[in-house]
Amino acid sequence: MSAATDQILEQLKSLSLLEASELVKQIEEAFGVSAAAPVGGMVMAAAAAAPAEAAEEKTEFDVILEEVPADKKIAVLKVVRTITGLGLKEAKELVESTPKAIKEATGKDDAEAIKKQIEEAGGKAAVK
């Protein structure tokens, strides 16, 4: 790879989920393409690969914010901002649009710690 592509790749790795989503939308608009998964053959290939993956031990987990009681929204919002590094507006949108992934592809211990922080703040989270 060239130095330019390496640099772009490193910048992409540092994006938050919200920033990555915004980037995808901008690319779709700029180039007139769609990031939607093709239907048909890919679905069949994914279904065939699923049993083989099930045999392997899962090492990456997603933390999903499932529910936030109205009286606990501020406390959960603070925890979400700490975990994700999002700004106030982005974190508020994430908290208000549950269920939503807060952290993806993280280790089991980290995922459990994040879930515990959210639950201590009054929210409901799941590790998947």
Swiss-Prot record:
UniProt GO cellular component terms: cytosolic large ribosomal subunit
CDD domains the record matches: Ribosomal_L7_L12
InterPro entries tied to this protein: Ribosomal_bL12, Ribosomal_bL12_C, Ribosomal_bL12_C/ClpS-like, Ribosomal_bL12_oligo, Ribosomal_bL12_oligo_N_sf
Pfam families to which the protein is assigned, alphabetical: Ribosomal_L12 (PF00542), Ribosomal_L12_N (PF16320)
Keyword Protein biosynthesis in record: no
Disulfide bonds: none
GO biological process, one term: translation
UniProt KW keywords: Ribonucleoprotein, Ribosomal protein
Record Gene3D superfamilies: 3.30.1390.10, Single helix bin (1.20.5.710)
An annotated Gene Ontology molecular function: structural constituent of ribosome
Role played: Forms part of the ribosomal stalk which helps the ribosome interact with GTP-bound translation factors. Is thus essential for accurate translation.
Family: Belongs to the bacterial ribosomal protein bL12 family.
NCBIfam families: L12
Subunit structure of this chain's protein: Homodimer. Part of the ribosomal stalk of the 50S ribosomal subunit. Forms a multimeric L10(L12)X complex, where L10 forms an elongated spine to which 2 to 4 L12 dimers bind in a sequential fashion. Binds GTP-bound translation factors.
Protein name, UniProt field: Large ribosomal subunit protein bL12
Protein source organism: Synechocystis sp. (strain ATCC 27184 / PCC 6803 / Kazusa)
